[in-house]
């Protein structure tokens, strides 16, 4: 059994079923009880976590995908999915499509994107939402602001010294997109 909370990957052993309940023994942590409830998976409340219900991911991930890939694809689809129109910036008037698998089309200079969800990239963006945009494997961090149907993408300006961890602050606006 494996899962991630965005900060660490947690592994454990799935132990036998007792009256419809599976026990997951996480190494270095307490155990959790899992039980199917119709189409949902129910995690019983424990010492460190409340009761949680999980649905099967509607967007399948390829075999061998990293931990968290189902969540990431569902988030990308719900938050970024659909058609966007560039209302200001390079490519004005073009339609942009953000895909659940991290592909992007129609945004000049980018063929892939990734939202910063946790870890170092989150700590480097000073509380701002950030994303990675790249083309042909080369890319940069960007700050973004989502307000309803508007998505503003700003340059990420590094205010750290060369020997420090980057600290990104919002710079000039590169694009303004509107969800269609």
Give, region by region, the residue ranges found by the protein language model.
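Low-complexity, repetitive regions of proteins mediating host interaction that are extracellular
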Residues: 1, 59-68
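Contiguous, well-ordered beta-strand patches that form the walls/edges
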Residues: 1-40, 88-95, 104-179
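N-terminal start-of-chain detector that recognizes signal peptides
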Residues: 15, 56-58, 68-70, 124-126
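Short beta-strand edge/turn micro-motifs at domain boundaries
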Residues: 42-63, 83-85
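N-terminal helix-cap/turn-to-beta initiation motif at the start of protein domains
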Residues: 64-85
């Amino acid at each position: 059994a494996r899962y991630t909370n965005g900060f660490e990957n947690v592994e454990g052993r799935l132990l036998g079923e007792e009256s419809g309940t599976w026990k997951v023994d996480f190494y270095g942590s307490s155990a959790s009880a899992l039980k199917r409830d119709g189409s949902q998976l129910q995690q019983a409340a424990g010492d460190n976590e409340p009761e949680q219900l999980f649905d099967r991911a509607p967007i399948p991930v390829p075999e061998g995908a990293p931990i968290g890939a189902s969540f990431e694809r569902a988030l990308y689809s719900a938050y970024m999915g659909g058609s966007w129109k560039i209302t200001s910036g390079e490519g004005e008037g073009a339609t942009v499509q953000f895909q659940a698998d991290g592909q992007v089309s129609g945004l000049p200079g980018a063929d892939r994107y990734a939202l910063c969800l946790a870890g170092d990239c989150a700590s480097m963006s000073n509380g701002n939402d950030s994303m990675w945009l790249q083309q042909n494997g080369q890319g940069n961090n960007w700050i973004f602001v989502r307000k309803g149907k508007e998505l503003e993408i700003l340059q990420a300006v590094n205010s750290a010294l060369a020997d420090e961890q980057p600290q990104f602050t919002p710079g000039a606006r590169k694009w303004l997109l509107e969800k269609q």
